[in-house]
């Protein structure tokens, strides 16, 4: 979902309306806050053109952390970024990619890799599950050069993301274990909180982090 900051109050809109909302923001020169990394990748040319209309498109951190470190490292040279996402089967069983490829996650007893590719491919294959892959790619070496693995792990109760970064300024690892949202097990509770934090940051006179 995304938030269009209107003159009065924000309106929350389904991701399918991303392009129309983005175009309206550009036309009216209004900032856009979103957690839809896949929506940004699908409309990347429009996002790049935001500079021409002096409009800011903000991709909130969502369910991941460490984007400030990735952005800082990208000012130098990043050699590689690998992201490994592991989720309980109930968080992935309704994903379009899983259904289309008839991947069985029932009665799973051991971890099972269900996707391996780039962050671009992963964000488009799992638009409701791994928007964080797009965020990691955009903050760092680029989504086409960011490696991504997605696992279904029956032993987990939380959605887990690990990011491994090698660069000329620092090598670092990021790990987060997100509590599942009751409304959508594929999304972590912290995702909505990241949008609130983003809005507070915009309104605050003090900014922490890159």
Where would I find each of the regions flagged by the language model?
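Short glycine/serine/threonine-rich phosphate/pyrophosphate-binding segments
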Residues: 15-20, 42-43, 66-68
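Active-site-lining helix/loop region of Rossmann-like oxidoreductase modules
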Residues: 57-210
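Short amphipathic alpha-helical segments and helix-helix/interface helices
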Residues: 22-23, 43-48, 70-71, 196
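Rossmann-fold NAD(P) dinucleotide-binding segment
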Residues: 1-37
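Rossmann-fold NAD(P)-binding glycine/threonine-rich loop
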Residues: 35-56
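Structured helix-beta-strand junction loops
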Residues: 28-29, 49-54, 77
């Amino acid at each position: 979902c995304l938030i269009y900051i209107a003159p009065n109050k924000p309106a929350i809109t389904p991701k399918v309306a991303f392009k129309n909302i983005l175009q309206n923001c550009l036309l009216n020169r209004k900032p856009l806050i979103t957690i839809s990394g896949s929506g940004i990748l699908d409309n990347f040319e429009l996002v790049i053109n935001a500079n021409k209309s002096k409009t800011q498109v903000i991709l909130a951190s969502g369910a991941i952390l460490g984007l400030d470190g990735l952005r800082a490292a990208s000012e130098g040279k990043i050699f590689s970024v690998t992201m490994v996402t592991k989720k309980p089967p109930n968080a992935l069983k309704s994903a379009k990619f899983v259904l289309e490829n008839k991947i069985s996650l029932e009665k799973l007893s051991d971890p099972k890799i269900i996707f391996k590719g780039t962050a671009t491919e992963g964000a488009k294959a799992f638009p409701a599950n791994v928007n964080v892959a797009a965020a990691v790619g955009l903050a760092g070496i680029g989504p086409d050069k960011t490696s991504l693995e997605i696992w279904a792990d029956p032993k987990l109760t939380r959605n887990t993301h690990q990011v491994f970064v090698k660069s000329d300024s620092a090598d670092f690892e990021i790990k987060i274990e997100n509590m599942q949202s009751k409304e959508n097990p594929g999304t972590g509770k912290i995702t909505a909180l990241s949008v609130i934090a983003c809005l507070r940051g915009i309104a605050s006179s003090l900014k922490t982090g890159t």
